[in-house]
Structures are given as structure tokens and as C-alpha cells.
């Protein structure tokens, strides 16, 4: 399959030819996720799941990215980003794209997913479809399970418009009549607590054993008049407001955890950035809501269905409508030995999640917690959860008298509250808990175990590209390296010293680490490939990351391509530049081959290095925040067999994908990869599932 894209020269394009707006690039990624919902290669319930993922993704996009641009616009910022757009222009483009995408999302739901589910006897019944017996059951359910937890709020001078929680389901009700106090009430708001399920399954005896469900919104809509005795509800309309959820935290505070706790509550009531209403909501009602939330019609989204598809989930009992479950395999090296420590002493061990099990990582900690020869355990935690097995094992180790040090990043977005709880659990167990470096998020993924062996201290290290989160390790692809390499272990030790103590930058032997050496060394590696290409030697760079937005590296990749280096990019969601193919195709010997796939999380950097390839795995994407504002670890893969595995399975395999990959075009748009004439179908992730059976 020929997907090469010829690069451009720096003198032949303006900045907006070279760069893609970051917000629009992220939105493009979400649109590619939405396209999975119409892909016939996916089973039906997996397609439905992609619709829900799209909703969750879009929620966060508005909460963080759109909210940030709105703040720039509100402050009168008219400066242009590298792509040439002002904040106002970005907001307009987002609105146009998002409105069209959401309309398409609900059309897919109503015209494709729900009808096909009905063919499988999975139904979401509308109010008019209920039988008398089902209606009676729903009424009883409302009276016993729903009404007691609802709080209807009339809107009058004594009851101003309530502060509604971010992304909560609410109903605005139009009324006729007078209440118990003789007041004429025209409007009321009914918030639906998050504790209520959004989908209610009817009993089997009322459905003939079929999976019939009723939306909570339909139940409330049908019986909303019961909440206003003596009055008549003439209309009931769902709505949902999305708010700015980014946290503004002063880095100079004395107690980061305490300050963060104080800020978390504000996230629920930040400035409104989007209003969703149902299509049947009258104009005078949504205009009233827009005024209350200080929004305009550009920020209004009318939807043909429930206003929150992200919670449209249920435990459907249809295995044939889902992918077969995959049981992650345990590498053979662990099956040949009783101890993780003895396995790691024999060789470096590469784990490729979710195809290979995350269990060896947990087992390393468990053995360390219970081994009398283990003296200390040190670990970074970014997203884990207080109830995770890793946190529980670390707490056990501390209670067993081990010196446990946890470097917890409290500011991991949307996991702040959970991470505070993790810190409390570990502190109560006796662990030393630190929050990293003020002004820098700790994003490196590192474990170090110190063990006494033959009167010497031996270190065991795990380095990863993804979080220490067992559930995520079953969903996202990541690499982990388990090693006793003395230089790597010493480097990890020095980074932990940086994180917990004070002193100058640690000089490392093998690891590259941000914010100190990583960016500069990446530039050096690219320069070496440029020199090789100019000398007539084969030169190739492959970058597999979630995001590539750092301008210096982007410019250096352009330079490399112009020099004749083959540049292959595998980017999950955020890409800041375009290849320029539409204007400058065929003018240079170098090529760009840029593609994207969903649910990939590995960060791998490959430099051909004149036949002696360099392969690094890392916690860092190629973004300003990772390279300059975070503590990151980038580790070399040196074992020839492991290098071959990563190159073939983690890089070349994805470059050959012609089913799930999307290819970047010269105008910044993406097209779905298609097999060339006579070319075999190739799905990279499916190939790995087959490999690791």
C-alpha cells in the first residue's frame, strides 16, 4: 500500500500551511472515534459503545479545550495561533464541526443502532409503546424509587434559578395552576440525581424474557405532574449544561493536597460552555436557559434523544454482539520460575499490554511486600485509584515494615480526588508520600524494588509507557520493561532522588528524562538521521505517540524529510502539522507516512541509526507539556530480541494496517486506509490478538 506523502521546504509555505489548529486536531480524533460506530467490522454492541465513548470524549473536549479557548476570547485575546486562527475563529469552526458531528451521532443511534438492537430483542421503549402492565410497573417504580429522591424547584423571586452541577441531567417543566400557597408558578426545574440509573430494565415477566428498557428521562417525563400536586405540567424538557472543568491552582500554596481539595468543588460549577436540549424544546424555553447560563445559540445543541448518551449503558446479555473476550497471556519466562525476582535476574522482560498480562507487575510488588529480604519500594502513581490492587499491595508493604515511597501526582486531570484518597491510604499505612516537584507534573512510570542478596543491595525496576492501572492495562496498549540492568536501575534511583529530595539535575547513564535531556536528545537523534540521509545512507524515523504538537520537533521532522529521511508517524489523537502534499508533492526525496489508530497509548521512538537501530519507549508524548513541564522517563530497549519485537509488532505492524488506520492528507484531513488492489487485509490489533493467544 503506497501511502507516502512528500514533504515541503520551509521557504515554500506559511505557518498556516504547515500547522493544524490543536483544538480542531483533537476534534478530528473524536470524529474518527465516531466513525467506528458505523463500521460493520465491529459487532453491534461495540458500535454502540463507540457512540458512548464519543459522548464522553466530547464532554471532556468542551470542559477543557473549548473552555480554554472561550477564556481567551472573553479576555479579548485576538492573537493567532501557529495555524493562523484567532480564538473567535477557532470557536466558530468548533461549533460548526461539533454541531454536525452530534447530529450525525444521534442519526446513527436512531437509524442504525437502535433498530438493529430491536432486531435482537433489545429495546428502549418509548412511553407510547408500554403495555398497561408495563405502565403500571413504571408508575410504581417512579413512586418508590425515583420520586423520593427528586427535588422539584419552582422558579420565582423566592426560588432563583438553581446552580446545576456540571453534566447533570435536568428537566425544565412548564406549569399551569397555583401551588399550595396560591402562587402562580409557570416554570420549575427538576434535577435528576446521579444516583439514579439512566436506563431501567423491565422485569422479564412483563417482556416475555426480552431485554426491554425504559429511559429514566421517559419515566420522569411521564409522571412529572405527580411532583406538582394540583397543577398541570404542560411541558417537560431535558437539558444538560457542560461547564469549564479545568482547575486553576496556585503552585505556591503551602499544602498542595489541601489546596486541591478546595478547588475540586468549583469544577462542578464552573462557567457554562455548552447547553444541550431535546429537539422538541420550545424556543422561548431554550432562550431562557441560554440567558441563565450566559450562552449564545452557537453554544446550544439540540439532540434527538437522551441528552447524555455517555450514561446510556446496560449489561446486555448478548455475547455474540460483542468481541470475544481476550485473556491476556503471561509470558513464558514467568511460568518457568516461582519468583518474579529470579525471572528478572535472567533477562530483561518486555510486557505488551493488553495482549500480555499486567499481573507480573502486581506480582513484583506483592512479592516485594512479603519478601523479608526486600528493604524498600519506590513507585510513581499518576492514575491508580485507592481501591486498586497496586495501592493495596503498597499499603501492605508499608505495614510490613518496608520503606515505601510513593510519588503521587495529585493533579492528574479528573483523577485528583482519587489521588488524594490514594495518598491518604498510603500515609495511614506508613508510606512516605510526596507530590513530586512544584510546577512540574510527575508523569514518569517507574517502580524500583531494593532487595538484599548475598550481603549486597540489588535493584529491580519496572519502566512503563502507561499508568499503573490494571483496568486501563486491559483496554489501552502500552509497553512495560522489567529489568535489573545496573545503569538503568541507577538512573531510576537518581530520578527518585530528584523527586523526593533536592539538588542539581541528575546525570543519567541511559535514561533520557524530561524536562532536562529528552527534548535535546531527540533533536540530536533526528540530526543524526539527517546526516545519514545526506551521506547517502538509509535513514528512517518512526514516532508512535498519542500527540505530536511540539513546534521544534515538528520543524526538525520537516527538515529530516527534506533531507531524504523516511518519516513514519503513528499518532493517536493530537497532531499539529500537515504534510503540505497538496502544494509540494514530488519535490523532495523524503516522505511522510502519517496515520492514526484508536485506543493506542504506547510511546515508541525509532531511529534507524545506519543499521544499528535505536528504540526508546517513554511516558512522554511529543508535546510542550511533556517535554518541558513534566517529569518523564524515556528508556532504551537494548536486547536485540526485544528491539525486533517492538519494531515488528509495535511499529511495522501498524504501518501495514489497512483496516483501522486513518491516513493524513496534505490539506490536514484524514481518510480511512484502504487495501490496495490485491493487498491482504491487515488489522494491526487483530494481528496482535492472534499472536498472543
Swiss-Prot record:
- Which InterPro entries does the entry mention? PP_kinase (IPR003414), PP_kinase_C_1 (IPR041108), PP_kinase_middle (IPR024953), PP_kinase_middle_dom_sf (IPR036830), PPK_C_dom2 (IPR025200), PPK_N_dom (IPR025198), PPK_N_dom_sf (IPR036832)
What is known about its processing and modification? An intermediate of this reaction is the autophosphorylated ppk in which a phosphate is covalently linked to a histidine residue through a N-P bond.
Q: Which Gene3D superfamilies match?
A: Endonuclease Chain A, Polyphosphate kinase middle domain, Polyphosphate kinase N-terminal domain
Keywords of this protein's UniProt record, alphabetized? ATP-binding, Kinase, Magnesium, Metal-binding, Nucleotide-binding, Phosphoprotein, Transferase
Q: What is its EC number?
A: 2.7.4.1
Task: Cite the CDD domains for this sequence.
Answer: PLDc_PaPPK1_C1_like
Q: What is this protein called?
A: Polyphosphate kinase
Q: Which gene encodes it?
A: ppk
